[in-house]
Amino acid sequence: ADLFTQYRPLFTGGLARLSQGVVFPQGYQAHAATETCPGHSTILTGAHPGNNGIIANNWFDLGLAREDKRVYCSEDPTVEGTSSASGRYAPSPQYLRVPTLGERMRAADPRSRVVSIAGKDRAVIMMGGRGIDESWW
């Protein structure tokens, strides 16, 4: 379902301004990592997965100090007692190596507010980056 189109008539204020923008219904990303986390991080940073640090939703890091070597794209594996396999992890943009659009907006104007809302933590974190004012998932 296209929720943006469905709820567009109800938008007011800043959200209504989205209707004045541009829509790319057949947008294309020139990289092979077609999972959510690398897709969101690529769109909101302008950098391909190899450069932005988010190569997949999950990958293995044999250098991790914990027994579980699987890494979730939006976790901080240095938080003790966490494991992506168990579902108990600390959400974090730790692996994101470049600034997001929100971070660049704030750098240009400190009055900018960065709000990231999505159905999953990885989408919120990859789209909002560091220093999110509000994050909901």
Where are these regions (language model features)?
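Solvent-exposed, polar/charged alpha-helical surfaces in well-ordered, non-transmembrane soluble domains
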Residues: G13-R17, S41, P99, E103, ...
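Short, solvent-exposed turn/loop segments enriched in Gly/Ser/Thr/Pro and often Arg
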Residues: F24-S41, S116-I125
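Active-site-proximal N-terminal segment of extracellular/periplasmic enzymes that hydrolyze or transfer
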Residues: A1-V22
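Soluble non-cytosolic domains of exported or imported proteins
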Residues: T5-L10, T34, P91-P99
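His/Asp/Glu-rich, glycine-adjacent segments
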Residues: A47-W137
